[in-house]
From Swiss-Prot:
Protein name per the record: V-type ATP synthase beta chain
Recorded GO MF terms: ATP binding; proton-transporting ATP synthase activity, rotational mechanism
Statement: the UniProt record of this protein carries the keyword Transport: yes
Family membership: Belongs to the ATPase alpha/beta chains family.
Pfam families recorded: ATP-synt_ab, ATP-synt_ab_N, ATP-synt_VA_C
Gene: atpB
Taxonomic lineage: Bacteria, Pseudomonadati, Spirochaetota, Spirochaetia, Spirochaetales
GO biological process: proton motive force-driven plasma membrane ATP synthesis
Function: Produces ATP from ADP in the presence of a proton gradient across the membrane. The V-type beta chain is a regulatory subunit.
């Protein structure tokens, strides 16, 4: 039953308060102002005092305006017609296409029963050596991409969306600059991936509260497709904007702040979204990659700090590259023993030598004498960074492993690598150029 009220008790920021009965948490309402109407959601219940956040903002809203409660929580249409479409944070078309009102599903439900989950066991190939070789992305994994403003994290998401071997991409943007939104849209269209992509976007020009629904709507749709047997990759950017929106609402609601003004339930709110990652027995899966920008490159900032306790590793994007030392995929050992017998050896050896090369780079910068071993390490460092770490590199895993052997053979002798003899005999390039 729809209930209509015509008296607003208070207006604070994007939050209005009314006195109403029989209202449930999360229920939607329509706020009808003089010249417009806007969707609102119940975010707090205090007996008969009901607080709602207005998605379109409260500009132009007066205390005498009408509030019509709809009797249900946020819903979104679910069907194959979503593919190739672009929507806003409320599920309304943003691409000029028709509205979709059939087969509505509620968003923001609980995570799947743990007994329905299976142990992660399949690799997701991305064509990026720094992921596929060194920190393999595993189906049903949840990983953040830690970065700072100015790094090409959205460009990285575009490459993953274009190259990842999955059935479906769901892209959720929060606080996107309009140029970034157009970059996503144009790149996916040119790359031919828009037909397998669903885009839910909130731009920096939209009401800040609308960004709160983007992860929930993206993950709810992903779950339905996963239950239909689809391998779904959810790409979210930027979870710090999502947390900042929660912070703004909590301040408006005069809640007791926690670390740096964020709400006390920040960890729970983030975990609730990340725990949607799952591999269903006999069905599909949901894998989550979420950009999390770190203000001031501070990993102790509440958003990345809490995220690190929830997820199964992280990718660090620094200097336009995925940093090998800070990045970690905790589930990579579940799959990299099943790819090729030299995978783990190449991974360990190349990272070990690259770490050693950093000492040689410092020695050269400080003017110390360079040994022949230092010269080899410097050559190796340059080749590793240009051929492996560059984000423009797009090669299959097997070619990346072969490339690893070529780089090693170009810089070192077999003995200098410390690799076992049986693998040397099997994979070492015939022409040694060390």
């Amino acid at each position: 039953m729809k209930r209509v009220y015509s008296k607003i008790e208070s207006i604070a920021g994007n939050v209005i308060t009314v006195t109403a009965q029989g209202i449930k948490y999360g229920e939607l309402a329509i706020v009808k102002a003089k010249d417009t109407s806007s969707l609102a959601e119940v975010i707090k219940l205090d007996r008969e005092k009901v607080s709602l956040q207005v998605y379109g903002g409260t500009r132009g809203v007066s205390t005498s305006d009408e509030i019509k409660f709809l009797g249900h929580t946020m819903q979104v249409s679910f069907s194959d017609n979503l593919l190739g479409r672009i929507f806003d944070g409320s599920g309304n078309p943003r691409d000029g296409g028709p509205s979709l009102d059939d087969n509505l599903i509620e968003i923001g439900g609980p995570s799947a029963n743990p007994t329905k989950r299976i142990v992660p066991r399949n690799m997701i190939r991305t064509g990026l050596p720094m992921i596929d070789v060194f920190n393999t992305l595993v189906e049903s994994q949840k990983l953040p991409i830690f970065s700072v403003s100015g790094e090409p994290y959205n460009e990285l998401l575009v490459r993953i969306a274009l190259q990842a071997e999955v059935d479906l991409i769901i892209l959720g943007g929060m606080g996107l600059k309009h140029d970034d939104y157009l970059t996503f849209k144009d790149s996916l269209e040119k790359g031919g991936a828009l037909s397998r992509t669903i885009f839910f976007v909130h731009t920096a020009n939209d009401s800040v509260v609308e960004s709160l629904t983007v992860p929930d709507i993206s993950l709810s749709v992903a779950e339905k497709f996963a239950l239909k047997g689809k391998k779904v990759l959810v790409l979210l950017t930027d979870m710090t904007n999502f947390a900042d929106a929660m912070k703004e609402i909590s301040i408006t609601m005069e809640q007791v702040p926690s670390n740096r003004g964020y709400p006390g339930d920040l960890y729970s709110q983030l975990a609730y979204r990340y725990e949607k990652a799952i591999d269903f027995e006999g069905a599909g899966s949901i894998t989550i990659l979420a950009v999390t920008t770190m203000p001031g490159d501070d990993v102790t900032h509440p958003v990345p700090d809490n995220t690190g306790y929830i997820t199964e590793g992280q990718y660090y994007l620094k200097g336009g590259r995925i940093e090998p030392f800070g990045s970690l995929s905790r589930l990579k050992q579940m799959v990299n023993s099943k790819t090729r017998d030299d995978h783990r050896t190449i991974m360990d050896t190349m990272i070990k030598l690259y770490a050693s090369s950093k000492e040689s780079v410092e020695k050269k910068a400080m003017g110390f004498n360079m040994t022949k071993w230092d010269e080899k390490l410097l050559k190796y460092s340059n080749m590793f960074e240009s051929k492996m770490m560059d984000l423009s590199v797009n090669i299959p895993l097997e070619e990346a492993l072969d490339l690893g052997w070529d780089i090693l053979a170009s810089c070192f002798s077999p003995k200098e690598t410390g690799i076992k003899t049986d693998l040397i005999q099997k994979y070492w390039p015939k022409k040694e150029t060390y």
